């Protein structure tokens, strides 16, 4: 496990105040939006037919729906993130109070994990692969010393859901489909933006541009994981993020079945390890 660059500028929770409305559109993955969200796969089409569809259907639709979203004031982004001292032991990952954070190597807690874990404020228990290389997410965090884990929660806002209900109830299913797809991708764009901010904060954006306007959605240092996926399948662990980041202050809530509302919202944990990657268990 490699050590994260120091110093970390703060520990605990922070709300990203930067106006990211227009910025978010530049972070949208349009291939996913058009093919997966809107269902335009282009299968069986020639290169010329695909380009014609892009020029005459998809891009005009995108610009029109974007204009409607802005005109109606639907997009109200919230970006919350935080840094918490962390340790791992086997499959478990322990989070500690921000007061145990450090600003120099001399301040890093190095007492044994057996002693330190008694002070943990939250614990994750991740599954481990039963085949080589036997990975678990906990492997990407130091065991013999305190490390840092980043948490994120972002939302495109509750007005999307209300407007989508209006469209659906009116039988305007095509427009509902377009608005819903773009709203979901705006939430994903916000997740990418806050992840980029984390890489900038931690000094691990060395191979990409050094501002939020420098879009980099692949081949970056570290990895972002959302609960419910194979490496961290326990949806109930989302409550840890809610307990620490307190997104309820911004109208973001967790249901009894651990679904996030509004729907155009997402949470994640961020590993800064350079070898962190997506994997199945």
Tell where the protein language model's regions lie, with residue ranges.
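Active-site loops and adjacent core secondary-structure elements that bind or stabilize anionic groups
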Residues: 1-177, 202-204, 212, 252-264, ...
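C-terminal amphipathic alpha-helical interaction region
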Residues: 178, 184-185, 189, 194-281
């Amino acid at each position: 496990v490699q050590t994260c660059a120091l110093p970390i500028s703060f520990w605990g929770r922070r709300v990203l105040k930067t106006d990211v409305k227009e910025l978010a559109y530049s972070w949208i993955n349009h291939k996913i939006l058009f093919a997966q969200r809107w269902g335009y796969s282009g299968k069986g089409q020639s290169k010329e037919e695909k380009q014609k569809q892009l020029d005459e259907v998809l891009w005009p639709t995108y610009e029109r729906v974007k204009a409607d979203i802005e005109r109606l004031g639907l997009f109200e982004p919230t970006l919350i993130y935080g840094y918490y001292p962390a340790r791992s032991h086997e499959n478990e990952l322990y989070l500690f109070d921000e007061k145990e954070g450090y600003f120099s190597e001399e301040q890093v807690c190095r007492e044994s994990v057996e002693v330190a874990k008694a002070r943990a404020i939250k614990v994750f228990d991740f599954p481990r692969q039963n085949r080589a290389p036997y990975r678990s997410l906990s492997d990407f965090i130091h065991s013999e010393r305190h490390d840092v884990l980043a948490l994120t929660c972002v939302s495109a806002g509750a007005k999307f859901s209300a407007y989508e209900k209006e469209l659906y109830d009116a039988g305007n299913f095509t427009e509902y489909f377009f608005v819903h797809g773009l709203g979901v991708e705006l939430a994903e764009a916000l997740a990418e933006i806050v992840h980029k901010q984390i890489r900038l904060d931690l000094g691990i954006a060395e191979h990409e541009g050094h501002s939020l306007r420098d879009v980099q959605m692949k081949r970056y240092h570290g990895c972002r994981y959302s609960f419910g996926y194979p490496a961290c399948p326990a949806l109930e662990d989302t409550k840890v993020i809610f307990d620490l980041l307190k997104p309820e202050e911004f109208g973001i809530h967790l249901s009894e079945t651990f679904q996030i509302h509004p729907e155009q919202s997402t949470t994640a944990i961020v590993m800064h390890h350079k070898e962190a990657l997506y994997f199945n268990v």
